[in-house]
Amino acid sequence: MNTLDALDAQSLRSDIPAFRPGDTLKVHVRVIEGSRERNQVFQGVVIRRQGGGVRETFTVRKVSFGVGVERTFPVHSPNIAKVEVATRGDVRRAKLYYLRELRGKAAKIKEKRETAPAS
């Protein structure tokens, strides 16, 4: 293993839950204002995940006061305090860019049902 791979392996985070495009996430972001630090929650739908390793990013979209807002986060960033999966979405695409043109209930993503094991 060369030096860069070893450095990348040290920077990877293991506390990030598994999530896919279509899932609704609560991303707790560390915000530093002057000398104070606080956590800010950004909740929205994952519209894409791209890259791999340390360079992996994901984009979350939400509608705030009628305006669509998208934020792209590095998965392994130290500025992310934690990531929670609010709901699992049932989608058939890896990139959900089509949500940008949809309004209201049309932009709603079906929730994935968890199948109970047969007993």
From Swiss-Prot:
Keywords, ordered alphabetically: Ribonucleoprotein, Ribosomal protein
Any one GO molecular function term: structural constituent of ribosome
Keyword Transferase: no
Example of a GO cellular component annotation carried by this entry: cytosolic large ribosomal subunit
GO process terms (BP): translation
PROSITE patterns named among the record's database cross-references: RIBOSOMAL_L19 (PS01015)
Pfam family, one: Ribosomal_L19
Family in the record: Belongs to the bacterial ribosomal protein bL19 family.
Protein's job: This protein is located at the 30S-50S ribosomal subunit interface and may play a role in the structure and function of the aminoacyl-tRNA binding site.
Name of the protein in question: Large ribosomal subunit protein bL19
Originating species: Saccharopolyspora erythraea (strain ATCC 11635 / DSM 40517 / JCM 4748 / NBRC 13426 / NCIMB 8594 / NRRL 2338)
Source taxonomy: Bacteria, Bacillati, Actinomycetota, Actinomycetes, Pseudonocardiales
Gene: rplS
